[in-house]
């Protein structure tokens, strides 16, 4: 059997006597300094209080054990992307100040690039990214900016339905901003040749009148309809309308109107025939 563990002498403290006179006379207690305690303390005996809970500690330890990248993954060093000003992206003939009304752009430092980049890139052999950045975006971005300004004017961001069609506006803008048509007058969307041919083969349904009217015109229509409705609800007006209806039925007004228009059509037909007879009698000069 193992021997019982002995307690060091410097840990033992003297207890005061339990006599009745202890309240008046106390036995002095020897004080022991902290520096004299040189007991070896193991790591499992003392644990520091942590602010994190157990779950956070487990997650932190698991993340520390995991590698930063999966096996077989290679970090690709991508080149530094420089931002070019919008003015250099536009073709000749486009005004960046007109479509981007900003006094100046805050640009980062960049390496100088050749001015005629579009001339050195072959559109048939270049990559899709180079083709978009060189031939598509310089033309399309100003059109998209104008499209957003026009959509704001048409209140597309405020209403659920409008007469504004974004594709039609962009087609019209690109057609009129074509450098090959420099100096030619403005052409409306429905007057563009390929648009006319397309609409002949695939006609569009008519746009509702509520979308074509302006706010002032729509207000006049609504006010006139409401006033007429209020007037017709008057009892005296209703009585007058009933009397007029009975009068039309008694005198056969509808039948008389049909006879009148039939006579008018007959007169017009006879007049057209009389005008056609002298034209047929005219001799055509021989060549």
From Swiss-Prot:
Signal peptide: none annotated. Coiled coil: none annotated. It comes from the Eukaryota. This is IQ domain-containing protein K. It comes from Homo sapiens.
């Amino acid at each position: 059997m193992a021997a019982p563990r002995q307690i060091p002498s410097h840990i033992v403290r003297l207890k005061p006597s339990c006599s009745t006179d202890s309240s008046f006379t106390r036995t002095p207690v020897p004080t022991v300094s902290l520096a004299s305690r040189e007991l070896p303390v193991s790591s499992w005996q003392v644990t520091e209080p942590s602010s994190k809970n157990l779950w956070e500690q487990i997650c932190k330890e698991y993340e520390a054990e995991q590698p930063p990248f999966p096996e077989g993954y290679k970090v690709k060093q991508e080149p530094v992307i420089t931002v070019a000003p919008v003015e250099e992206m536009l073709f000749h003939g486009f005004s960046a100040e007109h479509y981007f009304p900003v006094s100046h752009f805050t640009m980062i430092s960049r390496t100088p690039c050749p001015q005629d980049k579009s001339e050195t890139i072959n559109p048939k052999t270049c990559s899709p990214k180079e083709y978009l950045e060189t031939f598509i975006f310089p033309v399309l971005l100003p059109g998209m900016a104008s499209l957003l300004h026009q959509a704001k004017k048409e209140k597309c961001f405020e209403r659920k339905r409008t007469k504004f069609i974004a594709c039609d506006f962009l087609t019209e803008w690109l057609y009129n901003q074509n450098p090959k048509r420099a100096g030619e007058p403005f052409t409306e969307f429905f007057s563009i040749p390929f648009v006319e041919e397309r609409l002949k083969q695939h006609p569009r349904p008519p746009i509702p009148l509520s979308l074509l009217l302006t706010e002032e015109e729509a207000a006049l229509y609504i006010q006139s309809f409401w006033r007429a409705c209020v007037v017709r609800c008057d009892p005296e007006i209703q009585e007058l309308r009933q009397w007029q209806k009975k009068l039309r039925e008694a005198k056969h007004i509808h039948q008389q109107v049909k006879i009148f228009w039939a006579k008018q059509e007959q007169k017009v037909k006879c007049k057209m025939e009389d005008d056609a007879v002298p034209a047929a009698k005219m001799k055509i000069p021989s060549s």
